[in-house]
Design a protein with these regions (language model features):
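Glycine-rich phosphate-binding segment of PLP-dependent enzymes
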Residues: 44, 65-75, 126-127
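Gly/Ser/Thr-rich active-site cleft segment
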Residues: 77-142
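Carbohydrate-associated surface elements
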Residues: 58
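Residues that scaffold the ATP/ADP-binding catalytic core of kinase and kinase-like folds
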Residues: 52, 64, 68, 121
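Residue-level structural signal for beta-strand termini and adjacent loop
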Residues: 54-55, 132
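Residue-level signal for well-ordered alpha-helical scaffold segments within enzymatic catalytic domains
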Residues: 16, 20-23, 67, 96-100, ...
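Short, charged, surface-exposed secondary-structure boundary motifs
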Residues: 63-67, 138-141
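N-terminal glycine/serine-rich phosphate-binding loop of ATP-dependent small-molecule kinases
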Residues: 1-52, 62-63, 79, 107
C-alpha cells in the first residue's frame, strides 16, 4: 500500500493557520517549511502535479537500488554525492517511478522536494534549497 501525501489538505491547513494569525494580529514576517528530505513532487509544464506523491515509508523502493546500480555503482554514487545509501533516498524513489510510471518522468518539467513545493504554493517561486536537495542522493557537492 502506498503512503500518499495529501497536499491539498495539508496546504489548506497552512492557509488556515495563516488566516488565524491574521485574525489575532500575529502576522509572521517569514516562514520556513520542514519535512523529511527525500520526498518530492513532479510537476508538468503547467505546474500540475504528476501522479500521487508517495512518502518515503512506502515499499515501492524495494529492489530499486539494484536497478540504479545498473547505471552507476554504489561506490561511484557515494563518491559523487557523499550521501549514504538508504533505500528510501530520492534516487531510488525516482527509479520506482521510472519502472511503474515512466510517463510521469517524460512529462515532468520540475522536481521539487516537498518543502520546496510548499514554498512554491506559498510564493509562486520554484526553488531548490541546496541542503534539502542533497538528502536525496542526487547532488554532487563538488
Amino acid at each position: 500500500m502506498f503512503t500518499i501525501m495529501e497536499f491539498d489538505r495539508l496546504f489548506k491547513e497552512v492557509v488556515n493557520g495563516l488566516k488565524k494569525c491574521k485574525e489575532i494580529g500575529k502576522i509572521p514576517v517569514s516562514m520556513g517549511v520542514d519535512t523529511w528530505g527525500v520526498d518530492f513532487v513532479l510537476l508538468d509544464k503547467n505546474d500540475n502535479v504528476l501522479g500521487n506523491t508517495v512518502g518515503y515509508r512506502d515499499h515501492r523502493t524495494e529492489g530499486m537500488d539494484k536497478e540504479v546500480y545498473k547505471a552507476i555503482s554504489l561506490k561511484d554514487l557515494y563518491a559523487r554525492t557523499g550521501i549514504q545509501k538508504a533505500d528510501y533516498n530520492t534516487i531510488y524513489q525516482l527509479m520506482a517511478v521510472k519502472k511503474k510510471h515512466p510517463e510521469y518522468l517524460e512529462q515532468a518539467e520540475t522536481l521539487l522536494h516537498v518543502p520546496d513545493y510548499f514554498h512554491f504554493l506559498l510564493t509562486g517561486q520554484k526553488t531548490c534549497e541546496y541542503t534539502e536537495a542533497t538528502t536525496g542522493q542526487l547532488v554532487s557537492p563538488i
